[in-house]
Every structure is written in C-alpha cells, then in structure tokens.
C-alpha cells in the first residue's frame, strides 16, 4: 500500500490487469526518471526513452516507485506511459503520481498530445 491521500477509483485490476505470471513474483528492474526540460509529446518521450535503452514504466512499476520514494511526487508529477486505460467515452488515461493540496495523489491523467515541461516520465531499462 502506497498510503496515498487520494486514489483514482478507476485504478483497478479490471482496468489495469496484472499478468498472472507476475503475481507473487519479485523482479528487479533498473529505472530512470526522464525529464526533458521542455514540453514534449508522448511519442517523442517514448522515442527518446527507447533511444537510451529504456521503455515506459507500467502502473505496477510506478506504484513501486511511489512506495519506495513517497516524497518524490511532491517535487513533480511522475507519469507511467507504459499503462494506458481507455474509458467508455474513448478517452485515454495514464497513471500519474502527483500532489493534491498537500496530499500525495495516485491519479489518471489524460494521455495528452503534449506534456508540460514540469512532468517526469518513469522508464525501465530494457
């Protein structure tokens, strides 16, 4: 449990299924927070991660980051582009760690065309 002050109700195992082979398994991964210091599209962010030998993190990997480093999201919002959920209206969302008032928030952000420069993107070494 990440002890978030607020969690989006749409973050469920139904919307973000866990592959059966991963349940109960401990996997070590090398992660990196990408910050581009400029507005960037999801496509460009993923391309730059790929060029550096990384892939976008999933919701599960983002949750581990939030558990291990609970104060990090107070500095900047952190996006996991590796997990996308599409709602009934065909809007696409990605998991995000951020703050709400002074509390830690686990939310879904719209998968936008361009992300503001203050966002960070969690990635995992391939």
Give the residues covered by each predicted segment:
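A binding-site-centric feature that preferentially detects glycan-recognition modules on secreted/surface proteins
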Residues: 1-55, 60-126
């Amino acid at each position: 449990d990440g002890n978030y002050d607020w969690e989006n109700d749409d973050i469920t195992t139904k919307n973000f299924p866990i592959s059966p082979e991963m349940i109960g398994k401990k996997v070590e991964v090398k992660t990196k927070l990408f910050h581009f210091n400029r507005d960037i599209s999801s496509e460009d962010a993923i391309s730059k991660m790929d060029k550096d030998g990384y892939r976008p993190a999933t919701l599960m990997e983002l949750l581990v980051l939030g558990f291990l480093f609970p104060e990090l999201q107070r500095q900047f919002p952190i996006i996991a582009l590796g997990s996308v959920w599409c709602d009934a209206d065909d809007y696409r969302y990605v998991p995000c760690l951020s703050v709400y008032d002074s509390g830690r928030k686990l939310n879904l952000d719209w998968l936008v065309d361009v992300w503001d420069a203050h966002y960070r993107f969690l990635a995992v070494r391939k």
